[in-house]
Amino acid sequence: MRQKIAEQIAIGALRYFMLKVTRNSVIAFDFKDALSFEGETGPYIQYAVVRIRNIFRKGNTTPDAALADFANLSAANLGSYLAGDANEDIWSLWLRAGRRTQILEQCIATSEPAYLAKHAFQLAQEFANFYHRHHILTEEDPARKTFLLATAAIALRELVGALALLGIESPEAM
């Protein structure tokens, strides 16, 4: 298992490093930088996926269950969860997650996968901001907790999808 995870991280690091730059860029490859868990790297994005999966594991639920529960929330609750500056990161995360189709169209039109790579990195950053600001598993309001879990589920779905399109596997653990 550890060998498989190490391979996923190494291959993901290399692929992301090669895909994050546009075709006309000069590449100076540094494996140490590519394998870093900080900055614009494949492992940073893979770690975001693992972190989200751990939220669901610790919460004894699944992303699908969170989204099903979210569908049953009242619209009145949603308005209060999105109001105010304190929830700007939630808006940013949902907006970024919803842009994948637009980004893919841009990649196709320009033959540049770098746009999708950048999108995946920015989505991982948006999730990190959201995660640091909102205590998902310890949220006391059940409806708000459902909303936060659904937000994490959307981020997970979009990150895994973006990585898959880049040919990068999403490890179960790191």
Q: Where are the regions a protein language model picked out?
A:
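Non-catalytic interaction-recognition regions
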Residues: 1-174
